[in-house]
Amino acid sequence: MSRSIAQMIDHTLLKPNTTEDQIVKLCEEAKEYSFASVCVNPTWVALAAQLLKDAPDVKVCTVIGFPLGATTPEVKAFETTNAIENGATEVDMVINIGALKDKQYELVGRDIQAVVKAAEGKALTKVIIETSLLTEEEKKAACELAVKAGADFVKTSTGFSGGGATAEDIALMRKVVGPNLGVKASGGVRDLSDAKAMIDAGATRIGASAGVAIVNGERSEGSY
């Protein structure tokens, strides 16, 4: 079971003080455990792509408009294009959270579409809605906008805004997006039990810095 879960894990390192040696270790672990991807900040994409060139099943994932989601659609589109040029094959973008709360749904939709269009045919797009900052109504609206924009996944959290994934949020997101969109649980998934709870609730991908601990049946005390 833990081995099949490994293939659902985005092995994640997004800390601002990340070093090159840590990225090398992250990629080595991803190859050893057959994780779905490594998820790194944009500055590390080219290195990760180089390190994983002999492991085509391990994707290179990066983050866009991260962690606040407060850049413009044009900037997010440029970030996406640049990341893909550097070797990213998956992008996790943060929505404009304030615009969602203001019910500026057209702006939020345009924000997501800018990244989807920039990534089209080249990279999967995952939409981070930052569940810990949203009401249930806002979570539903964000998921609906992601579906409408043509995203591939919805994702719970950045790991930088306090709360992380909950099984309740995953179940709600799965209900809204239906069976055909991916749902990624991220933030606070620290052991195999946490991961199984998210998968049982409807998650198809797990974002975690604790990937090795998860597949080894241990527990990690990280924030992501």
From Swiss-Prot:
**EC number annotated for this UniProt entry:** 4.1.2.4
Q: Supply the enzyme class, top level.
A: lyase
Question: Where's it found, cell-wise?
Answer: Cytoplasm
Q: What is the protein's known function?
A: Catalyzes a reversible aldol reaction between acetaldehyde and D-glyceraldehyde 3-phosphate to generate 2-deoxy-D-ribose 5-phosphate.
The biological pathway it contributes to is:
Carbohydrate degradation; 2-deoxy-D-ribose 1-phosphate degradation; D-glyceraldehyde 3-phosphate and acetaldehyde from 2-deoxy-alpha-D-ribose 1-phosphate: step 2/2
* Originating gene: deoC
Question: Is the keyword Cytoplasm assigned to this protein?
Answer: yes
The UniProt entry lists the main location of this chain as cytoplasm
Task: State the InterPro entries in the record.
Answer: Aldolase_TIM, DeoC, DeoC/FbaB/LacD_aldolase, DeoC_typeI
Output the GO biological process annotations, alphabetical, semicolon-separated. 2-deoxyribose 1-phosphate catabolic process; carbohydrate catabolic process; deoxyribonucleotide catabolic process
- The identity of this protein, by name, is Deoxyribose-phosphate aldolase
**Which HAMAP family does this UniProt record tie to the protein?**
DeoC_type1 (MF_00114)
Q: Which reaction does it catalyse?
A: 2-deoxy-D-ribose 5-phosphate = D-glyceraldehyde 3-phosphate + acetaldehyde
A Gene Ontology molecular function term for this protein is: deoxyribose-phosphate aldolase activity
- Specify the species: Halalkalibacterium halodurans (strain ATCC BAA-125 / DSM 18197 / FERM 7344 / JCM 9153 / C-125)
Query: Would you identify the family this protein belongs to, as annotated?
Result: Belongs to the DeoC/FbaB aldolase family. DeoC type 1 subfamily.
Transmembrane: is it a keyword of this entry? no
Active site annotation, chain numbering: 92 (proton donor/acceptor), 155 (schiff-base intermediate with acetaldehyde), 184 (proton donor/acceptor)
Keyword annotations of the record? Cytoplasm, Lyase, Schiff base
Extract one GO cellular component term from the record: cytoplasm
